[in-house]
Every structure is written in C-alpha cells, then in structure tokens.
C-alpha cells in the first residue's frame, strides 16, 4: 500500500533546466520535458502518455527576436491561461505575436497552498497527456480542411537580452511563436485577411443584439468536425476568435478561427487510474485510431453551448455534406505532408502511429457528423435577438414542425433570418425564445404531440397568434411573462404564467445562462 501511495502521489521534483546541446549559432537540440519520464510502476497507474516524446531531444531553431520577423519583435506583456505561459510581442507595424510555452503548468489553477503538494505534483505530472508538438502540425491539416488557423513555429528562446524585463521568466525554453488573432489581420491569409478579428465575447454579444450579425454556420461546423478529427475536446468559447466580413446585403458575417491546440491528440487512458477517470470524465478522450462513437457527446461537451446556438439552422444533410467534404480533403497525402514538418526525431518516433490514427479517424467523419447532428437535434433551443423578430411555426407534414425566423421591419417586408424543419423522430423538445424586442410568434398550425413546443416571450411587447382551426392533440405551451403579451390562441395551447428567469428574458441573460459572456 505504501508503494501504491508513493506512485499515486506523483512526487515529481521541480524540473531542472533542460540540457541544451548547441548544434550551431541558430540551432539547438533539447527535450521539451525530461522531467515527465517516470518509473514503470508510476506509468502503470498514471499512464505512459507522451512521456517518451517529452523526454526526446529534438533539433529546434533558436529564435532571434531582432530577426524573427522583418523589423524584429519587441516583448510587451506577459500573459497566458491557467496552464500556458505567454509572452506577447509586437512588430514595427504594431502587429501582435505571442510566444506560448510548450511545457504547461496546470497547478496555477490550484490554491497556492496545494500547488507544491501531492495534488499539485500529480497535476503537473499529467501535463504528459499533451503532445508537446501536436499544435505544430495543425496548420497544414487546417489549410487542407478549409479551416482558419494560427501558424505556430517551434522555436527555442535562449538567454536573449532582447527579452528585457521578461528575460528571467522566459529564457532557455521551448515555445510556439505565432500571430495573435486579434484586430486588423489583413496581411494574414490564414485569418481570411480580415480587417477585424474579434473575441467570442464580442461576437456572441453582437449575435444576440441584432440579426445583422451572423456566423457562417457551415464554416463553424467544418471547424468543429475538424476538432473531433484531431481529438481536441477543449473547445470552450475562449479557444476561438472570429474573422469578420461585410456581407453583400449589409450586416456582418463571422468565420471561426480556432486557436490553442494544446489538447489536440490527447492521450489519457493508458494508466490504471487514468483509464477509470476517463470513463467518469468522458470528455477526456484519448486520440486513438477510432473516434468513440458511443460518446460523441463527451468529446464535445465543452463546446456544447456554442454548438447548440450556432448550428441551430443546419439540417442533417448539411452535416453530411460538410463531413463528406472533409473526408475528401484530408487525404492520406495531406496527412503525410503535415506530419513531415515535425522535427526528424519526433517524426521517427511517432510519425507512423499518427499517420495510421489520422487516416483511421478520417474514415469515421461521416458517422461522427451524423451522431453529432442527432445529439444536437434531440433538444433544440432557438433564440431570437434583442431586436423585433417574427417566429413562424408551420406543420409541412405529419410529425414535422417548420420554424422560420424573420427580422421585422416597419417600412418593408420582413427578411428571413433562417428556417429549419424538425422531425419527431429526431427532436423531442423545441423551445423558441424571443428575448428582447417586440416579437411575434405566429402559429399557422400546431405540431402533433411527437414534438413538445415551448414559446418564451421574453422582454418587450410581444404577440402570440394561434391558428383559427380547432386543434386538440398538441404539446404546445406558451410561457407568458405577464408583461402585457397579447395572446390569441385556441384552447389546445397551454398558457403558463411565470416569472422569467433573467436567462430567458433578454440577450444579456442568455449569454449568462450559456456561459458565452
């Protein structure tokens, strides 16, 4: 038992400075994390993960801040997430770059008193679940997939005086150097040459403020299926930036820029304890040759609020078409070329393994997309905005419901925002949220009991208008906030008076509810 307890505590000592072998003035050979190499007993309980890869010395270029880009780079600010150390830099034109540490430290999320204890040491040890060179191969794959991407370069930062005040914290380590996807990016093709790249907080605020702002849903779906192919389960809203473009008919259209690929190619379930934890925390899915079709929900849990909102108008056929397109574009040749950018030591150790796994997962993309659609279609929430909308509900066929959402205009015909037909064999509950603005819910027909339909009026002076013909068999409910909503409904429609929670009332509440703020 003492031996088991010793193994479980993961008593990793603080890492010593890495052994650096100078090959030339511009090249070194160094391991990303030799401290993750552990005993066989420890690996049995806590997993082999990518420990061998972390301990492997690789040949890497030394970055010179004065020559890294034309005119050089100037460090301006230290930052980072709860596990990655970042250094923000700018070039002579004010374009921002970032150095992101290859090694991670998740203990920063713990209270200070726990960081150096057994829990902290175990968390630090489990950095070995990350492929230290995974993000480095993503750009070539993303380019082939038609997905926007950053362009990380694997570099070694020596004891460079140009680091200035950040020299002590950032010298003598491996980093990924990449553009920072923010602001004016007209010179970066992989960001769509967008003149304005925005944060998720800004974009979701705009999406619920007005129908003039929209995300290109098929492009977002393409990026999400690409995430699943990479096994990247950590796709919460802060992992995205958004390239904005002016639409032909007016308004703004957003295309996604995924960033931070730390959890792509995750390897977790190869230890006794981590295998058990993986079944409890089903989002911790290992990058294997086959995607776990039985738990596509777990793989996508972090992004579920975004997925439910941004993919709400897409059909199963849309999902199939995008998956088939990705299957065609991510060919074995593309995979082989992408892997070839790895340092030769890395490619020699795991190149064949990754080629096999990526090609195997590619064959599953259509099935994964179909499962993904089914999960999202089961319970649907369709929000409006804080401007006036008209929700039109019709029944095109038995056991079907069609919802069309229009932006209301005072002096011209209403304009279609989006429409989708729901089927009772796919969708159990369908909820429409007016949010702010003076909205109209127009029930031209009532759905059969196969689909439960809920209408939430929200803020503003709203109207809910039912069909003239009597209907008895329906599960349609209007949730009336009691703020003066006009109701003209047949008796078959239930009306429930309720005090709406803030998260059902307007755009700000919706963002809070789904943690998209």
Identify the residue ranges that each predicted region occupies:
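Bacterial signal peptide processing site
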Residues: 7-11
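Juxta-kinase regulatory segment immediately upstream of eukaryotic protein kinase catalytic domains
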Residues: 31-67
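A conserved hydrophobic secondary-structure block that centers on an alpha-helix together
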Residues: 129-139, 144-151, 209-238, 243
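ATP-dependent phospho-/nucleotidyl transfer catalytic cores
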Residues: 157-232, 245-255, 267-270, 333-341, ...
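Conserved ATP-binding subdomain of kinase catalytic cores across diverse folds
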Residues: 62-198, 252-253, 257-297, 421-422
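C-terminal catalytic region of ATP-dependent kinase domains
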Residues: 127-128, 244-420, 424-431, 437-454, ...
């Amino acid at each position: 038992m003492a031996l088991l307890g010793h193994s479980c505590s993961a008593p990793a000592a603080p890492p010593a400075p890495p052994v650096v072998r100078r090959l030339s003035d511009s090249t070194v050979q160094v391991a990303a994390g030799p401290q993750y190499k552990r005993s066989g007993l420890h690996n049995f309980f806590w997993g082999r993960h990518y420990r061998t890869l972390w301990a492997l010395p690789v040949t890497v270029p030394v970055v010179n801040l004065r020559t890294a880009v034309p005119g050089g780079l100037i460090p301006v600010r230290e930052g980072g997430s709860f596990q990655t150390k970042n250094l923000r830099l700018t070039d002579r034109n004010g374009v921002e770059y970032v150095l992101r540490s290859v090694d991670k430290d998740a203990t920063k999320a713990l209270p200070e008193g726990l960081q150096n204890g057994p829990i902290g040491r175990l968390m630090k040890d489990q950095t070995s679940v990350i492929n230290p060179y995974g993000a480095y191969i993503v750009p070539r794959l993303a380019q082939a997939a038609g997905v926007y991407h950053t362009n990380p370069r694997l570099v070694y930062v020596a004891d460079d005086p140009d680091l200035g005040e950040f020299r002590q914290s950032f010298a003598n380590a491996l980093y990924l150097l990449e553009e920072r996807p923010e602001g004016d990016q007209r010179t970066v093709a992989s960001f769509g040459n967008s003149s304005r790249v925005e944060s998720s907080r800004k974009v979701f605020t705009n999406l619920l403020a007005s129908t003039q702002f929209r995300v290109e849903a098929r492009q977002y779906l393409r990026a999400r299926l690409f995430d699943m192919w990479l096994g990247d389960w950590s796709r919460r809203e802060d992992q995205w930036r958004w390239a904005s473009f002016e639409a032909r008919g007016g308004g703004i259209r957003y295309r996604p820029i995924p960033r931070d690929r730390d959890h792509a190619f995750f390897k977790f379930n190869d230890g006794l304890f981590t295998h058990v934890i993986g079944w409890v925390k089903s989002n911790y899915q290992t990058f294997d040759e086959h995607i776990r079709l039985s738990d596509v929900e777990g793989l996508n849990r972090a992004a579920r609020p975004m997925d439910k909102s941004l993919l709400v108008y897409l059909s199963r056929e849309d999902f199939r078409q995008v998956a088939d397109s990705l299957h065609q574009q991510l060919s074995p040749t593309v995979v082989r070329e992408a892997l070839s950018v790895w340092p030769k030591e890395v490619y020699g150790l795991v190149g064949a393994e990754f080629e096999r796994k990526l090609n195997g997962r590619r064959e599953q993309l259509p099935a994964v997309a179909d499962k993904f659609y089914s999960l999202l279609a089961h319970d649907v929430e369709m929000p409006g905005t804080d401007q006036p909308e008209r929700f039109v509900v019709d029944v095109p066929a038995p056991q079907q419901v069609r919802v069309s959402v229009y932006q209301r205009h005072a002096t011209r015909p209403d304009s279609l925002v989006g429409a989708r037909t729901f089927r009772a064999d796919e969708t159990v509950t369908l909820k429409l949220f007016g949010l702010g603005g003076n909205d109209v819910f127009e029930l031209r027909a009532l759905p059969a009991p196969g689909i439960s339909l809920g209408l939430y009026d929200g803020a503003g002076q709203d109207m809910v208008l039912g069909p003239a013909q009597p209907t008895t068999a329906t599960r349609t409910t209007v949730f009336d906030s009691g703020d003066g909503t006009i109701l003209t409904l047949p008796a078959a429609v239930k009306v429930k008076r309720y005090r709406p929670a803030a998260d059902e009332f307007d755009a700000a509440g919706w963002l809070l509810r789904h943690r998209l703020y």
